[in-house]
Curated annotation (Swiss-Prot):
Cofactor: FAD
Cellular compartments annotated: Endoplasmic reticulum; Cell membrane; Secreted, Cell wall
Classification via InterPro entries: BBE (IPR012951), FAD-bd_PCMH (IPR016166), FAD-bd_PCMH-like_sf (IPR036318), FAD-bd_PCMH_sub1 (IPR016167), FAD-bd_PCMH_sub2 (IPR016169), Oxid_FAD_bind_N (IPR006094)
Protein name: Berberine bridge enzyme-like 3
Keywords noted in UniProt: Cell membrane, Cell wall, Disulfide bond, Endoplasmic reticulum, FAD, Flavoprotein, Glycoprotein, Membrane, Nucleotide-binding, Oxidoreductase, Secreted, Signal
Length: 535
């Protein structure tokens, strides 16, 4: 069914593309690419333009995850460069800059607001998905991973080398390493080990002048900025060198559901009191979602409690019985498995699914909207009930992720990297809704806005914090071709808190003319930033 829908999607896009408004002349840019690229690595086959409708369209759609922003007919899109070598990246930067063309950098295509493949000014997409090499050194417990590799590919590569090493990153196997790591990616190991950026020890980046830099040549300030501040404001991330972490051979996982009729609200309230205080080895996510009720046509809220424990069932049961008996966990709810198999469990794949599924790069275009929040104090039961009531207004898939903090997240200083959301948070919230009918877009965005407003009294304030990797244009943005510092401070302080000033300082030194920009990039205008106590 998905394949049929995707085929129809391509046909409709091709029809629109053939009738599109003529795009600006990209000839000078293309000629520059051919001149700048290394003769040993010809770039011609890496360039896709509208002149070849089929290949251009396939390249565009394959890594465009949010249909809400999919627009290959955009007259400003001059070309897609699918880099196969570092020289292709360098040539794209040099030629785009010299021709006054904006670059949008796309690794996995998971940018929630489409900023890696959409612009209202002339631009090119620099697609990194073919730069996906991964090397694992078990003896040093380190790995190099290129920006275009997916988390699934990284996890499989680590598992092939060792069953007692892992990397603390996200649960979505198709996310690209370039953007995920640079924004402070997290997963179910974060209470034990922190976020992705806490384990980056080197990086390769192409700067605004087309130079290839590493940690030594870029300097510690820029290296600090790209770990949590997002790489796309500072250059093009080519690869990361990461520390791997030691894990046991056996993990325990479970999934337990509680509907409202089963006392779900009371259980979630208690979860808020204990989830951030569990031993670091335990990550227990609460996932409220809309489900069908027991009666025909009835809908209710079910809270799915997903857990991962670095250890055996016996120890986990002891912790749960002592600290969270309200959940009613039974031994038969638990499954023991390897770290790699936990990634399949979190992907909701059945037991026995081959690990090769993590290597897939499926294209399932859907409409979706996501937002984020940070919670400092337990949400009262009446607040939870207001949230449930608003969720039930959706007529499509909607869920929240309550991701517990505590553990290592409390022990890493907020300025150790550019990712600032550390001690003081009980949990992070992700709001998510998805749909297939384009006619439902306006209604779903409206309800999502209402849900966000309903939650406002119960989350962080001054500022209302947000997670950069859950990009949300609603919290502030600039036009594609401009970066006003006052507007940038609105979204920048929500994403980066007290680290914003240093990020803008780094930007002023590394990209003073603001070549690398998008609607939510970091501006280089340090002189106009107020003091920290004024932000």
């Amino acid at each position: 069914m998905k394949e049929a829908l995707f085929g129809l999607y391509l046909v409709l896009l091709v029809s629109g593309l053939e009738a599109a408004v003529t795009k600006p002349n990209s000839g000078n840019f293309i000629e520059c690419l051919r001149y700048q690229a290394s003769p040993e690595n010809p770039i011609t086959d890496a360039i896709f333009t509208v002149d070849n409708t089929t290949t251009f369209l396939s390249s565009y759609v394959s890594y465009t995850k949010n249909t809400r922003f999919s627009n290959p007919n955009n007259k400003n899109l001059l070309a897609i460069v699918v880099a196969k070598d570092v020289s292709h990246v360098q040539a794209t930067v040099v030629c785009a800059k010299s021709n006054g063309i904006q670059i949008r950098i796309r690794s996995g295509g998971h940018d929630n607001e489409g900023l890696s493949y959409v612009s209202s000014v002339p631009f090119v997409i620099l697609d990194m998905h073919k730069l996906r090499d991964i090397t694992v050194d078990v003896s040093s417990k380190k790995a190099w991973v290129q920006a275009g590799a997916t988390l699934g590919e990284l996890y499989v590569k680590i598992d092939e080398a060792s069953q007692t090493l892992a990397f603390p990153a996200g649960i979505c196997a198709t996310v690209g390493a370039g953007g995920h790591i640079s924004g402070g990616g997290y997963g179910n190991l974060m209470r034990k080990f922190g976020t992705t950026v806490d384990h980056v020890i080197d990086a390769e980046l192409v700067d605004v002048n087309g130079k290839l830099l590493n940690r030594s040549t870029m300097g510690e300030d820029l290296f600090w900025a790209i770990r949590g501040g997002g790489g796309a404001s500072f250059g093009v991330i080519l690869s990361w060198k990461i520390n791997l972490v030691e894990v046991p051979k056996i993990f325990t996982v479970f999934q337990v559901n509680k509907t409202l009729e089963q006392g779900g609200t009371d259980v979630v309230y208690k979860w808020q009191l204990v989830a951030n205080k569990f031993p670091d080895n335990l990550f227990l996510r609460a996932m409220p979602q809309v489900v069908n009720g027991t009666k025909h046509g009835e809908r209710t809220i079910a809270i799915v409690f997903w857990a991962q424990f670095l250890g055996r069932t016996d120890e986990l049961m002891e912790i749960m019985n002592q600290s969270f008996p309200e959940l009613g966990l039974r031994r038969e709810d638990c499954q023991e498995m390897s770290w790699l198999n936990t990634t399949l469990f979190w992907a909701m794949l059945p037991a026995g699914t081959p690990k090769t599924v993590l290597l897939g790069r499926p294209t399932d275009p859907v409409f979706f909207k996501s937002k984020s929040d940070y919670v400092k104090k337990p949400i009262p039961k009446e607040g939870l009930e207001k949230i449930w009531k608003t969720m039930l207004k959706f007529n499509n898939i909607v869920w929240l992720h309550f991701n517990p903090y505590g553990g290592m997240m409390d022990r890493i200083p907020s300025n150790a990297t550019a990712f600032p959301h550390r001690k003081g948070n009980l949990f992070k919230v992700q709001y998510y809704t998805t749909w297939l009918d384009p006619n439902a877009t306006e209604s779903n965005l409206s309800i999502m806005k209402e849900l966000y407003e309903v939650a406002e009294p119960y989350v962080s304030s001054n500022p209302r914090e947000a997670f950069f990797n859950y990009r949300d244009i609603d919290i502030g943005s600039n036009p594609s071709g401009e970066t006003d510092v006052d507007e940038a401070k609105i979204y920048g302080y929500k994403y980066f808190l007290g680290n914003l000033k240093r990020l803008m300082d780094v930007k002023a030194k590394s990209d003073p003319e603001n070549f690398f920009k998008n609607e939510q990039s970091i501006p280089p205008l340090l002189s106009r930033v107020r003091r920290d106590d004024e932000l």
